[in-house]
């Protein structure tokens, strides 16, 4: 009997025992850094001379791992392995596949501190964020396993005299998973193993910045007894193998989390039917956001400031759900801005091994991009707090607040993906919702209000996939807050939802006459 789903807890770091335990995990992980990691194709570990170097973004002199780089021929071999494995994997019962996934999650649970510690080094994640990432990975696997058990029952349809009908689900084939670096375990594990528990096989191309943590999942899958070829590990340069993976005639689906430019490219290329392809590809894409917190009049300004600061600067603003726009009613604008500045000054920035609140941004490209946007912000508005940058050892950007902006300013329109939040003043709630919707994106949003009519208006008109009342706009929880957005934020394939696995299944009807 499978127990009821419960979210995996984190660690309470106010308890010294947990602090000591995690410090030990960090030391143990550090001893293992710098090793070469292979491709994994049909269960075979293949080491290549050409490597992708993963480095610690907080200390660029520290090499995390050297990941073997897949070629197009390696990808072709991986497709052959996945197609062959699919022949038997699809015949496993849904319960057997789900039970194997529960074994995977149990192993991850035992290794949770190790997995989180790796993300502190490889992604620059603060302790709480890293542990939360590992826990969310467990949640996704556990949730999808139970979802598959439910879907295995099919859905009732009508019978009639002399005719019995069945409506059920079946897997669709081999697909490709392209996860992001910002949730390098949770999203990577969830988007890889959701199609797997549904009976499909996968080629996993990890993010170039975080291949080591993805390889750890491959180790765990092997330990759990996943058959060879069901998941194949092909790290590589997206310029070399990205289009090849997407275009391949055997790619039935692509799950992608990342930039708008890449997501729209994948969506476009997937629409082309290749020679030898006799199906239409499915794309499950999450492409970021320009998320806003709307602050109404007559509210708790302390709560509003805390919601803005935690949502804007948690994990250095490197969440697709991060608050990058604060849209504040004129009557409380100055007070909310002042309190937000005060809270921001209290945040610690540094190497997250030392348990700072904020760490580095992920790489030099992102560092330069964010630095440029801060300069743009200085021209468009007023720099109120932060703005400093330092890449002498790692890629550090101070939490930055820019005020006096207008809705059409670049700081308010373009995704920055860093610790920068812009403030705009509005005259009333109607204008606030207009400004909130004045973007190509529609992922998350929050409204701070005590006015029920205003909240109902936001529910009906604030055009985002995930909307929150009187809290920040980040920290969706699997099972509670299915996650996905509208417009250019993606295909709104809600992760952690009862419907998510349907993207990897076909519906079949069988009618039997008597």
UniProtKB/Swiss-Prot annotation:
CDD domains (alphabetical): ALDH_PutA-P5CDH-RocA
Q: In which pathway does it act?
A: Amino-acid degradation; L-proline degradation into L-glutamate; L-glutamate from L-proline: step 2/2
EC number of the protein: 1.2.1.88
Q: Which domain of life is it from?
A: Bacteria
Keywords of the record, alphabetical order, are: NAD, Oxidoreductase
**Molecular-function GO term, any one:** 1-pyrroline-5-carboxylate dehydrogenase activity
Give the GO terms filed under biological process for this record. glutamate biosynthetic process; proline catabolic process to glutamate
Known catalytic reactions: L-glutamate 5-semialdehyde + NAD(+) + H2O = L-glutamate + NADH + 2 H(+)
SUPFAM superfamilies associated with the record: ALDH-like
SS bond list: none
The record's PANTHER family line, in alphabetical order, gives:
DELTA-1-PYRROLINE-5-CARBOXYLATE DEHYDROGENASE 1, ISOFORM A-RELATED (PTHR42862), DELTA-1-PYRROLINE-5-CARBOXYLATE DEHYDROGENASE 2, ISOFORM A-RELATED (PTHR42862:SF1)
Q: What is this protein called?
A: 1-pyrroline-5-carboxylate dehydrogenase
């Amino acid at each position: 009997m499978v127990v009821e789903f419960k979210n995996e807890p984190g660690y309470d770091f106010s308890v010294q025992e947990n602090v000591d335990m995690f410090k030990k995990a960090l030391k143990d992980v550090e001893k293992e850094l710098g090793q070469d990691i292979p491709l994994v194709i049909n269960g075979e570990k293949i080491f290549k001379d050409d490597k992708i170097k993963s480095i610690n973004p907080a200390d660029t002199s520290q090499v995390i791992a050297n990941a073997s780089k897949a070629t197009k021929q390696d990808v072709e071999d991986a497709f052959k392995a996945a197609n062959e494995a699919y022949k038997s994997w699809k015949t496993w019962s849904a319960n057997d596949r789900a039970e194997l996934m529960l074994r995977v999650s149990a192993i991850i649970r035992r290794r949770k501190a190790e997995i989180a510690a790796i993300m502190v080094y490889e992604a620059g994640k603060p302790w709480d964020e890293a542990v939360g990432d590992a826990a969310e990975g467990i949640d996704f696997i556990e949730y999808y396993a139970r979802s598959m058990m439910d879907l295995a029952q099919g859905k009732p349809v009508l019978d009639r005299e002399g005719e019995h009908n069945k409506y059920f689900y079946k897997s669709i084939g081999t697909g490709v998973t392209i996860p992001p670096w910002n949730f390098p375990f949770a999203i990577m594990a969830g988007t890889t193993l959701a199609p797997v528990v549904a009976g499909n096989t996968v080629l996993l191309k990890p993010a170039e910045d975080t291949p080591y943590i993805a390889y750890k999942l491959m180790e765990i899958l092997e330990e759990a007894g996943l058959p060879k070829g069901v998941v194949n590990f092909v790290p590589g340069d997206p310029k070399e193998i990205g289009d090849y993976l997407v275009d391949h005639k055997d790619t039935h689906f692509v799950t992608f989390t990342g930039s708008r430019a890449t997501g729209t490219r994948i969506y476009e290329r997937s629409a082309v039917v290749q020679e030898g392809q006799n199906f239409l590809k499915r794309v499950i894409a999450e492409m970021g956001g320009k998320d806003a917190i709307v602050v109404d009049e007559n509210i708790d300004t302390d709560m509003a400031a805390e919601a803005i600061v935690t949502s804007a600067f948690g994990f250095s603003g490197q969440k697709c759900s991060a608050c990058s726009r604060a849209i504040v009613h004129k009557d409380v604008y100055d007070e909310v801005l002042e309190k937000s500045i005060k809270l921001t000054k209290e945040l610690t920035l540094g190497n997250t091994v030392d348990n700072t609140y904020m760490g580095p941004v992920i790489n030099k490209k992102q560092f330069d991009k964010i630095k440029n946007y801060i300069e743009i912000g200085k021209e468009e508005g007023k720099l109120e707090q932060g703005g400093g940058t330092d890449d002498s050892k790692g890629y550090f950007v101070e939490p930055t607040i820019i005020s006096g902006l207008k809705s059409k300013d670049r700081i308010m329109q373009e995704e920055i993906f860093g610790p920068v939040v812009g403030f705009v003043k509005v005259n009333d709630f109607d204008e606030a919702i207009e400004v909130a919707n004045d973007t190509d994106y529609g992922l998350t949003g929050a409204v701070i209000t005590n006015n029920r009519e205003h909240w109902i208006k936001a529910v009906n008109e604030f055009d985002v996939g995930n909307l929150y009342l009187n809290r920040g706009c980040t920290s969706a929880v699997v099972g509670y807050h299915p996650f996905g957005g509208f417009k250019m934020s993606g295909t709104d394939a809600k992760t952690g939802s009862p419907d998510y696995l349907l993207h990897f299944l076909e519906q079949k009807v069988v009618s039997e006459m008597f």
